C-alpha cells in the first residue's frame, strides 16, 4: 500500500514537495491551495528563480488560503510557511509570473525590472517549445475564489514619456507597458480513466468599452400604454421600472463564448453527460485612450494613450448585487474570437407594483391599468461603489478573479423516448403476424376484462394499454401559452420543453421550445441598422413535456360502456361543447413526476444559473442546464473612471465635464468540464449531429467576411429511462 506520492501525506495529492502536478482533482481546499502553490513554484523555476530559498507571494497566498483550515495537513502547511516568512528573504514577482498574494493598491509608476528583458531573450531563444509551455501554464492567478474570496490585481507599468497632447497626463507613442498574458481559444480534451474526459475550454476576446453616457444611477419607468390600451394586446405589455447604472457587465455565460461548432459536434456525438467543474477569468493588457478634436475645418479626431486614466473593475464574488445573466437578452460577450466585442450596459429591475385588468366595459373598451408605484417596504437600491470592492487599473495592468468551483448536478447529452405508454412489460400476444409487412395487427387474444395486471380504475375490470398502472408520471401537464398575473404585471408561465406539436416547424415554438433572437455578435450573418434579428427555435427531443396543444384529461368516473359524454378530446373536451375547459386542465408536477433537465442550447443558450433564495426551490430552471446549488461565479463589472477637466463644477450640472475616454482590454477565461464518454448499447447505429453539403457553407465566411453560426442539437442520442 502506497502512503506517499513524492512527499505527499495520505489523503492529499499536492500538499508536499516532490509531487506531480497532474494528480487529478484536489481532495480538499487545502490540497487545492497546495496545487496552485506548486504551479506558482513551477512558474518561478521557469523564470530562473529558486522559490525554495526565498519567501514568495505564492507562500503568502497559501498562508491566507489555509488560515481557517480544519484539516491537519492544511494546518501544518500554514504554520510551516509562516515560519518560513519569519526567516527567509523575500522573493519579488516578475511580470511574467505575477503574485498570488492578496490585491495591492497601485503605487507609483516604476521601471520594468531588468529580468523582464532577460526572460524575453530566453523566450526568443527557446523558440516554439517555450511558447507551447507558456500556453499550458496556469493563468496569472490560480487563486481559489471561495464565497467572499478576493480577486488578484497586478500593477506593472513601464515608464513612458508622452509626446502627445492627450488629457489626464497621457502619453503619446512612448512605452505604455509590458505585454502580459496569452490569447488562447483552444479547447483541450484530456482522456482520463474509466471513460471520463476533462474538457478545458479557453476563451479570449478583445473588449471595447466606452465611457458611460452618465456617471449617475437612474431610475427609469417604462410604460407602453399606447399598445396595451388596445383590446387583446396584453402580450405586448412592456411596463416595468429599472435602475440604469454607469457600469457594464462582462458576461461569458453562453455556450458560444467557449466552444466553436466543431468542438460542440465532437462533444455531443461522443459524450453522454457533462459536469461543470470550475471557472476563472482575467482582464489584461489594459489600454486607455482619450479622444480630442482639432480646431481645423473639417475637424480631425486625435487619439492619445492616457497612462493615468483608470479602468474600474469590480467582482461581486458574494453575489450581493442583483443577478442579471445576459444570455436571456443575447448580450453576452461575442462568439467570434477574432472580432472585438463589447460588454453590455448593466441594469437591474426595481420594484414597482402595477395591475393590468384585461377587461372591457364594451366591445371597444380599453384594459384597466392601475399603477400603485413602489412600495416603501420593498425599496432596494444597489450601487456597486458601496457594495463591492472596486479595483483601479491603468495601462498595462491586469486583474484575475481566481478559480471558482461549481456545485451543480450533471447535464445529460441524451434524450429519452419513453413516455408512460412505453414503460414496463408490454401485453402478451397470443398470436403473432404470419406474413411480412402485415399492418393493423390488433389481436392481443385475451378479452379486456379477463386480463391480469394492476390498475387504479375502481369502476371497471378492463385492463388496457390506457388503464394499466404505470410506475410513475413521465413529464407533466401544463397550460399551453398561459399568462399569469403578478403584482408587477402579466407574465408568460415557463414550461419544460418537450417533444410534440409542430416539431418540424422551426419557425414556431411548440410545447415550450425556446426561440432565440440574436445579432451579429452572436451568429447572425448580416445586419443593418433596424434590421430584424435572426432567429431559430430549439426543438427539444425530450419527452419531458406532453402535447399541450392536444392535451386531454379524463376527470370523471370511468363508466361502462364509454359514452361520448365521458371522452375528452382536444376538439371536443366535453361532449356537446366546444373549446377547451380550463377547469379540467391541471398540473401533474407532483411527487410521482419524472422529469429530465433542460438541454444545453448551442450557441446562444445560458450555461449556469443562480439558485433562488427561497425555502421551496424549483427543481429545474428553463434557461440553463446547470443550477449552482450554493454560490455562483461573481458577476464582473467594468467602467471607465471619470476623466475630469479643469472645468468640472459639481454644482453647475448633473453631467460632469469629462475628457472623452475609452478603453480596450483583453479578456480571457477558462471553463472546465468533466464528461462521460457515451457507450454503445444498441445493435443499430444512431443519428448524430452532422451537416449536409449546403449547410457546411453556413460556417464559412463569404467574400466580405460575413458568416453565421447555426445552432446545433445537443441531445440527439436516445436512451431508455426505465
From Swiss-Prot:
Keyword Acetylation: no
GO cellular component: T=1 icosahedral viral capsid
Annotated segments matching region Phospholipase A2-like: 14-59
Entry's Gene Ontology molecular function annotations: structural molecule activity
A Gene Ontology BP annotation from the UniProt entry: virion attachment to host cell
Keywords: Capsid protein, Clathrin-mediated endocytosis of virus by host, Host-virus interaction, T=1 icosahedral capsid protein, Viral attachment to host cell, Viral penetration into host cytoplasm, Viral penetration via permeabilization of host membrane, Virion, Virus endocytosis by host, Virus entry into host cell
Region: Disordered, residue numbers: 90-115, 136-179, 497-531
Record keyword Coiled coil present: no
SUPFAM superfamilies assigned to the protein according to its UniProt record, in alphabetical order: ssDNA viruses
Residue stretches of biased makeup (Gly residues): 161-178
Free-text comment on this protein's domains from its UniProt entry: The N-terminus of VP1 is sequestered within the mature capsid. It contains a phospholipase A2-like region and putative nuclear localization signals.
Recorded family membership: Belongs to the parvoviridae capsid protein family.
Reported function: Capsid protein self-assembles to form an icosahedral capsid with a T=1 symmetry, about 22 nm in diameter, and consisting of 60 copies of two size variants of the capsid proteins, VP1 and VP2, which differ by the presence of an N-terminal extension in the minor protein VP1. The capsid encapsulates the genomic ssDNA. Capsid proteins are responsible for the attachment to host cell receptors. This attachment induces virion internalization predominantly through clathrin-dependent endocytosis.
Name used for this protein in its record: Capsid protein VP1
Source organism: Mink enteritis virus (strain Abashiri) (MEV)
Amino acid at each position: 500500500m502506497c502512503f506517499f506520492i513524492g512527499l505527499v501525506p495520505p489523503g492529499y495529492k499536492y500538499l508536499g514537495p516532490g509531487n506531480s502536478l497532474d494528480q487529478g482533482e484536489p481532495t480538499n481546499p487545502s490540497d487545492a491551495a497546495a496545487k496552485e502553490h506548486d504551479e506558482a513554484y513551477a512558474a518561478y523555476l521557469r523564470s530562473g528563480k529558486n522559490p525554495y530559498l526565498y519567501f514568495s507571494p505564492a507562500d503568502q497566498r497559501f498562508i491566507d488560503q489555509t488560515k481557517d483550515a480544519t484539516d491537519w495537513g492544511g494546518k501544518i502547511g500554514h504554520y510551516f510557511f509562516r515560519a518560513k516568512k519569519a526567516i527567509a528573504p523575500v522573493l519579488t514577482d516578475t511580470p511574467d509570473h505575477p503574485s498570488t498574494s492578496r490585491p495591492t493598491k497601485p503605487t507609483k509608476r516604476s521601471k520594468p525590472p531588468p529580468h523582464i528583458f532577460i526572460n524575453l531573450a530566453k523566450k526568443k531563444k527557446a523558440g516554439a517549445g517555450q511558447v507551447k509551455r507558456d500556453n499550458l501554464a496556469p493563468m496569472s492567478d490560480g487563486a481559489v475564489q471561495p464565497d467572499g474570496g478576493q480577486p488578484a490585481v497586478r500593477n506593472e507599468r513601464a515608464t513612458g514619456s508622452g509626446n502627445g497632447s492627450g488629457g489626464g497626463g497621457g502619453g503619446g507613442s512612448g512605452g505604455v507597458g509590458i505585454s502580459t498574458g496569452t490569447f488562447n481559444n483552444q479547447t483541450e480534451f484530456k482522456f482520463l480513466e474509466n471513460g471520463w474526459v476533462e474538457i478545458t475550454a479557453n476563451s479570449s476576446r478583445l473588449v471595447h468599452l466606452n465611457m458611460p453616457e452618465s456617471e449617475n444611477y437612474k431610475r427609469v419607468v417604462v410604460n407602453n400604454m399606447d399598445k396595451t390600451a388596445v383590446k387583446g394586446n396584453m402580450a405586448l405589455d412592456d411596463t416595468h421600472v429599472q435602475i440604469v447604472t454607469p457600469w457594464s457587465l462582462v458576461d461569458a455565460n453562453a455556450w458560444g463564448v467557449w466552444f466553436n461548432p466543431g468542438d460542440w459536434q465532437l462533444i455531443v456525438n461522443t459524450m453522454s453527460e457533462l459536469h461543470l467543474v470550475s471557472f476563472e477569468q482575467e482582464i489584461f493588457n489594459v489600454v486607455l485612450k482619450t479622444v480630442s478634436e482639432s480646431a481645423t475645418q473639417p475637424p480631425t479626431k486625435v487619439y492619445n494613450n492616457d497612462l493615468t486614466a483608470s479602468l474600474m473593475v469590480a467582482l461581486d464574488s458574494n453575489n450581493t448585487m442583483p443577478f442579471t445573466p445576459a444570455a436571456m437578452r443575447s448580450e453576452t460577450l461575442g462568439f467570434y474570437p477574432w472580432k472585438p466585442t463589447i460588454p453590455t450596459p448593466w441594469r437591474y429591475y426595481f420594484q414597482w407594483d402595477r395591475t393590468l385588468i384585461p377587461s372591457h366595459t364594451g366591445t371597444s373598451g380599453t384594459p384597466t391599468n392601475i399603477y400603485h408605484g413602489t412600495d416603501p417596504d420593498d425599496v432596494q437600491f444597489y450601487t456597486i461603489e458601496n457594495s463591492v470592492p472596486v479595483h483601479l487599473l491603468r495601462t498595462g495592468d491586469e486583474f484575475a478573479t481566481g478559480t471558482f468551483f461549481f456545485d451543480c448536478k450533471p447535464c445529460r447529452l441524451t434524450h429519452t423516448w419513453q413516455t408512460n405508454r412505453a414503460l414496463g412489460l408490454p401485453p402478451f400476444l397470443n398470436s403473432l403476424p404470419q406474413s411480412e409487412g402485415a399492418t393493423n395487427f390488433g389481436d392481443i387474444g385475451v378479452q379486456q376484462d379477463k386480463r391480469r395486471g394492476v390498475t387504479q380504475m375502481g369502476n371497471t375490470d378492463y385492463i388496457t394499454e390506457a388503464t394499466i398502472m404505470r410506475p410513475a408520471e413521465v413529464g407533466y401537464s401544463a397550460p399551453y401559452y398561459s399568462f399569469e398575473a403578478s403584482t408587477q404585471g402579466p407574465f408568460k408561465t415557463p414550461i419544460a420543453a418537450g417533444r410534440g406539436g409542430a416539431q418540424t416547424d422551426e419557425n414556431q415554438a411548440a410545447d415550450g421550445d425556446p426561440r432565440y433572437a440574436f445579432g451579429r455578435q452572436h451568429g447572425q450573418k448580416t445586419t443593418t441598422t433596424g434590421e430584424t434579428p435572426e432567429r431559430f427555435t430549439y426543438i427539444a427531443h425530450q419527452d419531458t413535456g406532453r402535447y399541450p396543444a392536444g392535451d386531454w384529461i379524463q376527470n370523471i368516473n370511468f363508466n361502462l360502456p364509454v359514452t361520448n359524454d365521458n371522452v375528452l378530446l382536444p376538439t371536443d373536451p366535453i361532449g356537446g361543447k366546444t373549446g377547451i375547459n380550463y377547469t379540467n386542465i391541471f398540473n401533474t408536477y407532483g411527487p410521482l413526476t419524472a422529469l429530465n433537465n433542460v438541454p444545453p442550447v448551442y450557441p446562444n443558450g445560458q450555461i449556469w444559473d443562480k439558485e433562488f433564495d427561497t425555502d421551496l426551490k424549483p427543481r429545474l430552471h428553463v434557461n440553463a442546464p446547470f443550477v449552482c446549488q450554493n454560490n455562483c461565479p461573481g458577476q464582473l463589472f467594468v467602467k471607465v473612471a471619470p476623466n475630469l477637466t479643469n472645468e468640472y463644477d459639481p454644482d453647475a450640472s448633473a453631467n460632469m465635464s469629462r475628457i472623452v475616454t475609452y478603453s480596450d482590454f483583453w479578456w480571457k477565461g477558462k471553463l472546465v468540464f468533466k464528461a462521460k464518454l457515451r457507450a454503445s448499447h444498441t445493435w443499430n447505429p444512431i443519428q448524430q449531429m452532422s451537416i449536409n453539403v449546403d449547410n457546411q457553407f453556413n460556417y464559412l465566411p463569404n467574400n466580405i467576411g460575413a458568416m453565421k453560426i447555426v445552432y446545433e442539437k445537443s441531445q440527439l442520442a436516445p436512451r431508455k429511462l426505465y
